[in-house]
C-alpha cells in the first residue's frame, strides 16, 4: 500500500495532472472553437493575449508543478519499487512528462511563438491562423488526453 509522503506525492500528482487535463480539455472543447469562429484578426489577437496571460504564477504552478511531481514520483518509484502501483505510477509519470509537458515544449510553444509574430490586422495572417488552430488543437487534444490518463493512472495506483 502506498502511504506516508509517497501517498501525498501520488495524490498531489493525480490532482495536478487532473487540473492540467481540465485546462487543456477546456481549450479543446470550447475556447479554441470560440476563437476560430471569430474573424481571423479578432481570433489572432485574442489568442495572442491568452498566450501572454498564460505565463502566470497560477498556471505555471499547476503546469510545472505537475511535471516536477511526476519526475519526483518516477524517481521515488524506481528507488522504492513498491509492491503496489509501480506500473501505474511510472505510466502516469511518463504520460504527463512526455504527453503533456513534452508536447507543450515541442509542439504548442513553437506554434504560440509563431502566432506572436503575426499581425492580426494583416489579411495574409488568416491562412497561418487557420493552420495554427488546426495544428495547435491536435497537439492540445494529446496534452489533454495524456494529462487525464496520467491522473487516472495515479488514482489507480492508490486503489
Please give the residue ranges for each predicted region.
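Mid-bilayer segments of alpha-helical transmembrane spans in multi-pass integral membrane proteins
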Residues: 97-106
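Hydrophobic residues within membrane-embedded alpha-helical segments of Major Facilitator Superfamily
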Residues: 9, 16-19, 24, 69, ...
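Interfacial loop at the N-terminal end of multi-pass membrane proteins
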Residues: 7-8, 19-64, 110-134
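Interfacial segments of alpha-helical transmembrane regions
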Residues: 3-18, 79-98
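Juxtamembrane boundary at the C-terminal end of a transmembrane helix
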Residues: 155-159
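Core segments of transmembrane alpha-helices
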Residues: 63-73, 143-151
Amino acid at each position: 500500500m502506498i502511504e506516508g509522503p509517497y501517498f501525498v506525492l501520488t495524490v498531489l500528482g493525480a490532482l495536478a495532472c487532473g487540473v492540467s487535463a481540465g485546462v487543456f480539455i477546456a481549450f479543446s472543447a470550447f475556447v479554441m472553437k470560440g476563437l476560430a469562429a471569430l474573424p481571423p484578426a479578432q481570433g489572432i489577437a485574442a489568442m495572442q493575449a491568452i498566450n501572454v496571460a498564460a505565463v502566470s504564477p497560477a498556471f505555471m504552478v499547476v503546469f510545472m508543478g505537475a511535471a516536477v511531481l511526476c519526475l519526483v514520483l518516477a524517481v521515488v518509484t524506481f528507488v522504492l519499487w513498491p509492491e503496489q502501483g509501480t506500473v501505474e505510477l511510472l505510466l502516469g509519470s511518463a504520460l504527463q512528462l512526455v504527453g503533456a509537458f513534452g508536447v507543450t515544449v515541442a509542439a504548442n510553444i513553437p506554434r504560440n511563438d509563431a502566432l506572436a509574430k503575426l499581425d492580426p490586422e494583416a489579411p495574409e495572417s488568416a491562412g497561418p491562423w487557420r493552420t495554427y488552430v488546426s495544428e495547435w488543437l491536435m497537439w492540445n487534444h494529446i496534452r489533454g488526453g495524456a494529462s487525464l490518463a496520467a491522473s487516472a493512472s495515479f488514482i489507480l495506483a492508490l486503489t
